[in-house]
């Protein structure tokens, strides 16, 4: 019964981790919580029973077991096959340089058939799958590469890219952290980890955290409301709004006057921005930080 409790504890731990992810609806998260409570009741296990924890997470145990049963024994690969597989890998690499990703996948697949215990072939195929937008297949290939070589940092890094593309930011952070543990000086892993962590913060909070811009706080800010009211009392703005309403209900065309209205609107907007800068500069700085943050994320993703 002790071994069964270890297994159930691992399952409960996995379900609890899943219930805390934002990929599920509130109803689905509630169902996971019910499942956890049922298992704890039936097997008389509580979160305090940490002595039942195993060293390896359930997902890693499953991946390792699955991949061991999914690939052929190493003894089935003969030297001739290994040599041919390496040639196919080189062909696949050339296809990648030429951006012929489908052909690259085909070459790596043939290499795997000849030498199924080479982690590099799975990892390279994962890169090609990601280029084709086949992120789920890329993750599977990375998992197989890791099962063969658990210290293969590049496999963790490429799995992080695929997970990020699927908006699985929490798992992506874990993958990048493992990649950095194995290759601490890799700037690409550091950059991509920061991006994944930032994305995770953004999706974890409705109003955003860190450098994210809180529009609700801006709109509800008393100083902002006061300045907006002052702007609407500006005679130029009132005249502009009156002219716009006249045109909207079929009045005379704007003509040259329309250009004057536009100039007045720009001038009023500039005055409003100056008032915010003078009376509440932290709001302007928050907006600037938000724009800088978005620009950094876009640039980093494009060069990952």
UniProtKB/Swiss-Prot annotation:
GO biological process terms, semicolon-separated: post-translational protein targeting to endoplasmic reticulum membrane; protein heterooligomerization; protein homooligomerization
TPR repeats: from-to residues: 15-49, 85-118, 119-152, 153-186
This protein's UniProt keywords: Acetylation, Chaperone, Phosphoprotein, Repeat, TPR repeat
Annotated positions of the N6-acetyllysine modification: 131
Residue positions where Phosphoserine is found in the record: 293, 295, 297
Coiled coil: none
Pfam families: SGTA_dimer, TPR_1, TPR_11
Superkingdom of the organism of origin: Eukaryota
InterPro entries in the record: SGT, SGTA_dimer, TPR-like_helical_dom_sf, TPR_rpt
Listed GO CC annotations: membrane; TRC complex
Single Gene Ontology MF annotation: molecular adaptor activity
Stored SUPFAM superfamilies: TPR-like
Similarity comment text for this entry: Belongs to the SGT family.
PANTHER family for the chain: LD24721P (PTHR45831), SMALL GLUTAMINE-RICH TETRATRICOPEPTIDE REPEAT-CONTAINING PROTEIN BETA (PTHR45831:SF1)
Subunit structure: Homooligomerize.
Function, in words: Co-chaperone that binds directly to HSC70 and HSP70 and regulates their ATPase activity.
Stated name of the protein: Small glutamine-rich tetratricopeptide repeat-containing protein beta
Species of the source: Homo sapiens (Human)
Lineage: Eukaryota, Metazoa, Chordata, Craniata, Vertebrata
Underlying gene: SGTB
């Amino acid at each position: 019964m002790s071994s069964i409790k270890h297994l159930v504890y691992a399952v409960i731990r996995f379900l609890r981790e899943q219930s805390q992810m934002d990929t599920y609806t509130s109803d689905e998260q509630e169902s996971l919580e019910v499942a956890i409570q049922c298992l704890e009741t039936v097997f008389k296990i509580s979160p305090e029973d940490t002595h039942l924890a195993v060293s390896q997470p359930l997902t890693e145990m499953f991946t390792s077991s699955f991949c061991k049963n999914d690939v052929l024994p190493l003894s089935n690969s003969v030297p001739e096959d290994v040599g041919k597989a390496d040639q196919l890998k080189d062909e696949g690499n050339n296809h990648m340089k030429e951006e012929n990703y489908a052909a690259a996948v085909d070459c790596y697949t043939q290499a795997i058939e000849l030498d199924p215990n080479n982690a590099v072939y799975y990892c390279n195929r994962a890169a090609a799958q990601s280029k084709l937008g086949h992120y789920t297949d890329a993750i599977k290939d990375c998992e197989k590469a890791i099962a063969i070589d658990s210290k293969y940092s590049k496999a963790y890094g490429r799995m992080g890219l695929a997970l990020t593309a699927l908006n699985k930011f929490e798992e992506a952070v874990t993958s990048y952290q493992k990649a950095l543990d194995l290759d601490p000086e890799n700037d690409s892993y550091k950059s991509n980890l920061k991006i994944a962590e930032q994305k995770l913060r953004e999706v974890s909070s409705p109003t955003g955290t860190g450098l994210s811009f809180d529009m609700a706080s801006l709109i509800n800010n008393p100083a902002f409301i006061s300045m907006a009211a002052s702007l609407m009392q500006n005679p130029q703005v009132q005249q502009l709004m009156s002219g716009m309403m006249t045109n909207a209900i079929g009045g005379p065309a704007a003509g040259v006057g329309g250009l004057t209205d536009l100039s007045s609107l720009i001038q009023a907007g500039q005055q409003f921005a100056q008032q915010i800068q003078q009376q509440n500069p932290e709001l302007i700085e928050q907006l600037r930080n938000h724009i800088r943050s978005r620009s950094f994320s876009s640039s980093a993703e494009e060069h990952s």
